[in-house]
Amino acid sequence: MVHFTAEEKVAITSLWSKMNVEEAGGEALGRLLVVYPWTQRFFDNFGNLSSPSAILGNPKVKAHGKKVLTSFGDAIKNMDNLKTTFAKLSELHCDKLHVDPENFRLLGNVMVIILATHFGKEFTPEVQAAWQKLVSAVAIALGHKYH
Amino acid sequence: MSLTKTERTIIVSMWAKISTQADTIGTETLERLFLSYPQTKTYFPHFDLHPGSAQLRAHGSKVVAAVGDAAKSIDNIGAALSKLSELHAYILRVDPVNFKLLSHCLLVTLAARFPADFTAEAHAAWDKFLSVVSSVLTEKYR
């Protein structure tokens, strides 16, 4: 069971409260599809993914990105209980979506980089470490029900 | 995996901007690495790893200088980093998984310092470039 210190929780929640989840979600998913183009395999029905600008402007990417990041918000409200919080989503990603859990790690790291672009100096090495711990724990929780 | 012309242009032009802050970028990258991935400290038992330590600064400079060498010889990274490749294979023997961790921390440092330049396209180019550098450094491992 992952334990977050009080400092780590503050580092995470304070940044999260300043984020535009809708925009950041689209950016995160968009960057995933741009930087790791093989991840597009899950989104054949998303329409035009032919270039970075097409991907980042794609309304389906933005909508889905918002969904994903909103769900991430649940993680932040339940940092001490991630495996239970994501049990159903874990089953979904395994049984229905057939997503390799490696993709959760890739998306987590893309999110960290987006936080860096948004917060600059404020995204100190200590703050990054707290976020790496969170994205890693979320990735593990999402993979937990795989069979 | 090889870099397209566009990717090379992105790396080379960004490097020109980055090189003025090379030393502090190197130090910050290592600080991020050791904090987020404490297991990487096992390769430095002989170092003082406190933030601001002279050894950390010197080593950070070295690392970023090597990335710079790769950028300056971007058409032949293998040749530019050949000696470093041997060093990593025969002497340092850093487990290959760590190159991804260091690369990620360098990307975070660049993203934090150059947010306007670090577009999705630039992010993709840098991720790929560092992946090529990592491959070169591990290609003699076995």
UniProtKB/Swiss-Prot annotation, chain A:
<dbReference type="InterPro" id="IPR000971">
    <property type="entry name" value="Globin"/>
</dbReference>
<feature type="modified residue" description="Phosphoserine">
    <location>
        <position position="14"/>
    </location>
</feature>
<comment type="function">
    <text>The epsilon chain is a beta-type chain of early mammalian embryonic hemoglobin.</text>
</comment>
<dbReference type="GO" id="GO:0005833">
    <property type="term" value="C:hemoglobin complex"/>
</dbReference>
<dbReference type="GO" id="GO:0031721">
    <property type="term" value="F:hemoglobin alpha binding"/>
</dbReference>
<keyword id="KW-0813">Transport</keyword>
<feature type="binding site" description="proximal binding residue">
    <location>
        <position position="93"/>
    </location>
    <ligand>
        <name>heme b</name>
    </ligand>
</feature>
<dbReference type="InterPro" id="IPR009050">
    <property type="entry name" value="Globin-like_sf"/>
</dbReference>
<feature type="domain" description="Globin">
    <location>
        <begin position="3"/>
        <end position="147"/>
    </location>
</feature>
<protein>
    <recommendedName>
        <fullName>Hemoglobin subunit epsilon</fullName>
    </recommendedName>
</protein>
<dbReference type="GO" id="GO:0072562">
    <property type="term" value="C:blood microparticle"/>
</dbReference>
<dbReference type="GO" id="GO:0005344">
    <property type="term" value="F:oxygen carrier activity"/>
</dbReference>
<dbReference type="GO" id="GO:0031720">
    <property type="term" value="F:haptoglobin binding"/>
</dbReference>
<dbReference type="InterPro" id="IPR002337">
    <property type="entry name" value="Hemoglobin_b"/>
</dbReference>
<keyword id="KW-0349">Heme</keyword>
<dbReference type="Pfam" id="PF00042">
    <property type="entry name" value="Globin"/>
</dbReference>
<dbReference type="GO" id="GO:0019825">
    <property type="term" value="F:oxygen binding"/>
</dbReference>
<dbReference type="InterPro" id="IPR012292">
    <property type="entry name" value="Globin/Proto"/>
</dbReference>
<dbReference type="GO" id="GO:0004601">
    <property type="term" value="F:peroxidase activity"/>
</dbReference>
<keyword id="KW-0408">Iron</keyword>
<dbReference type="GO" id="GO:0031838">
    <property type="term" value="C:haptoglobin-hemoglobin complex"/>
</dbReference>
<dbReference type="GO" id="GO:0020037">
    <property type="term" value="F:heme binding"/>
</dbReference>
<dbReference type="GO" id="GO:0043177">
    <property type="term" value="F:organic acid binding"/>
</dbReference>
<dbReference type="InterPro" id="IPR050056">
    <property type="entry name" value="Hemoglobin_oxygen_transport"/>
</dbReference>
<feature type="binding site" description="distal binding residue">
    <location>
        <position position="64"/>
    </location>
    <ligand>
        <name>heme b</name>
    </ligand>
</feature>
<comment type="subunit">
    <text>Heterotetramer of two alpha chains and two epsilon chains in early embryonic hemoglobin Gower-2; two zeta chains and two epsilon chains in early embryonic hemoglobin Gower-1.</text>
</comment>
<dbReference type="GO" id="GO:0042744">
    <property type="term" value="P:hydrogen peroxide catabolic process"/>
</dbReference>
<keyword id="KW-0479">Metal-binding</keyword>
<dbReference type="GO" id="GO:0046872">
    <property type="term" value="F:metal ion binding"/>
</dbReference>
<comment type="similarity">
    <text>Belongs to the globin family.</text>
</comment>
<keyword id="KW-0561">Oxygen transport</keyword>
<feature type="modified residue" description="Phosphoserine">
    <location>
        <position position="51"/>
    </location>
</feature>
<keyword id="KW-0597">Phosphoprotein</keyword>
